[in-house]
Amino acid sequence: MIPIRLYTMKRLSFIRYACLLFMVLIPLMARATGQIADDVIIDGEEWRLLGSPLSYNDSIYNRVDSLLPKHEDRSWSTANWSGFYGCWEIVDSCLYLKKIVVNMWDEHKKKSYVLEFDADTLRSVLGEYYTEHGIYARWYSREKLIIGRGELVTYVHGGYLRNHEEELVVTIENGRITHQEHWHNKKVMEGWSLSEGGLTKTGIQIRDSFPYDQFPEMGTKLIIVHVKNISLTSDGHFEDCDASFFKKYDNGEKEWIEDPNHPIIVALKETMRKMYPWEVIYLHGKYTISSPNPGSGFTLPLVNRQQKKAEE
């Protein structure tokens, strides 16, 4: 989640914003579902494509969709809204669509089945991309596309947010791979986690362990902190992170404080440093932690609950 610069929202009180934040986030997380990945063949071996080249371009998607059976006749789910997936192959560093597999449902027989549309059939709607190797994905460019295989090391119940034991991280420009990194990932140890199952417990521990007595000016005010880019040692010790927090001034102005030397940020990091062990994932050459929002971090409310309860 990217920090929102709330000082532009002068008509919303801080408490109203906090309520709005969680009202928005909770339904989104509840609806999120991990998406079925496309298949891709590389040097004769099967991998999983953690992205959707067909959905990258609306015109391409609509042309393909118009060729397939009506959506209401397909067997679709929240893990595959379209009801179909693509089978690809990488040949000489170029990405080709070989066929599309459509999941169907026979209402009369109460039985599922599949229909396949090969490159020759797809040629009728994607003729300008047709080659002897298949449909050349010249419409597709991506700075960072993950292609994986093997057991899952991380998994978030939404989109393609997961990591496999073995991964290729590639850059694609107009259907051609221009850069590739090959990684072997693994889960090193269990501990304090930011995964969907552990984030709540970890957040409560941070909230309840924060040294509120060092900041009497906070009183019972609620502040929102944002943490991302957590770095860990291989044996589960917290090293550092990027942190910021929301501050509301007496005159009503609001802003995010990002100064790493601010006492509240220093205290937050020290609180996290005292927590041990942290879950450790070896991912793409670094020791890190799984997160429901990889690269974006998480947002956490801090409030002195004991003082607030005493005042009540």
Regions found by a protein language model. Name each.
Residues 1-36:
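Bacterial Sec-dependent N-terminal signal peptides
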Residues 31-98, 102-104, 110:
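Start-of-domain marker
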Residues 35, 81-85, 163-166, 222-227:
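Short, surface-exposed coil-to-beta transition loops
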Residues 98-161:
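An exposed acidic His-Trp-rich patch
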Residues 142-186, 228-231:
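Acidic, small-residue rich beta-repeat scaffolds with periodic aromatic anchors
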Residues 173-214:
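Surface-exposed beta-loop interaction hotspot
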Residues 219-254:
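Short tight loops/turns at secondary-structure junctions
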Residues 250, 255-312:
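Short, positively biased Gly/Pro-containing turn/loop motifs at secondary-structure boundaries
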